[in-house]
Amino acid sequence: SPYGGEWANDPRERDLHTYDCVWEYPYKSYPNFISEHIRTAPPVRHSLEKIIRGSIWPEGFTGQILAESKNIMPDTWVERSHISAQGQRKTGDYWEFYDAKNADDLLYRLGAAYGKEIRRYGEQVRIGSKNPEVFSRRSKGYFACKLVDTWPKIYCASIDFFQEGYIPYYSLKRVFSPVLLCFQKEESIRLWGVNDSSKDIWGTVQYGILNIVSGRIQKAKEKKVFAAQGDSVIVDDLADFQFFSKDCVLFAVLDREDGEEALVCIDYVDIERHLKFPKPNLKLELCGDELVITAERFARCIQITGEQEGDKFGWLFTDNYFDMLPGQRKRVKILGNKEYGTLYVKSQYGCCRSISYTRGRI
């Protein structure tokens, strides 16, 4: 594998490996079947610290990419990369994110780039095709490569050797949740709804354009929607929004008639390093084993971590590394094997908040 087609890795027939990070080839927008989707990124920091030898940010390493630079990662990281498979070359588009000043910045830069690629390919497959009525041109499947590391290394796994998930894991979980809202950005911007749940779905979608810094909605619409079980539908074409500033985001919120939690989709029209993000002023509360987060302003990449007497391993959440709209209130269930500890919540461009946690406390 890959097998079939006019040449090896022909996206139009049989199966495809998504190595467009190192190869260029035609017909890749809606491949027939993705049998291996791969990008590379390090694991979470506490896992990385266990697998490398030496400093996590060696003296003299700046994070800058210059003409004479050999790698984007420090040598201590590269030693644990899958070098024979050119793992250091198979990153996502990290240059779309701000330069790194420290290890945490670089972990985010590489993780966010991988997560963005998972979302891009996952949404393409879920939508199926720009011409959904032509079944022969639909994408018909997707295998993430890979789900779990069987050896402590820096490569492509969504869950690392120590069973910790980082941005790629939660991106994968979101994009393949049964019900999906997503924006297709090609010759026009179209909002899609995908329903791979076990039942038909009715609801109301509010969608539009939001200025990141001011928090003001520039343009908005509301529409009743229906998505049959197993179907993907175009909710609307946003061409009538005409032009708008690239320091805005696209947003859509689905309120379901069956009472399930509202579904929120946020997407961008410019790369992250071109944008400025406000400090969101997060508020935290606990309702039993649910963490409730409220953002006063737009929040980029909310990151939830936990610690129990110095141990950062073993925490798991229903969602993590997500954006939030101004005024949004999000509930996240606390999973994992920890009975108590401290939860830390921060956005990528904001300060950190903490709250004490005891499992089962009301």
Report the location of each language-model feature:
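In a subset of proteins, long, contiguous C-terminal domains/tails are tracked
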Residues: 121, 138, 159-166, 175, ...
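Long, low-complexity ectodomains and other extracytoplasmic segments of secretory-pathway proteins
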Residues: 165, 175-182, 186, 261-287
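Short, well-ordered beta-strand segments enriched in hydrophobic/aromatic residues
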Residues: 189-193, 290-295
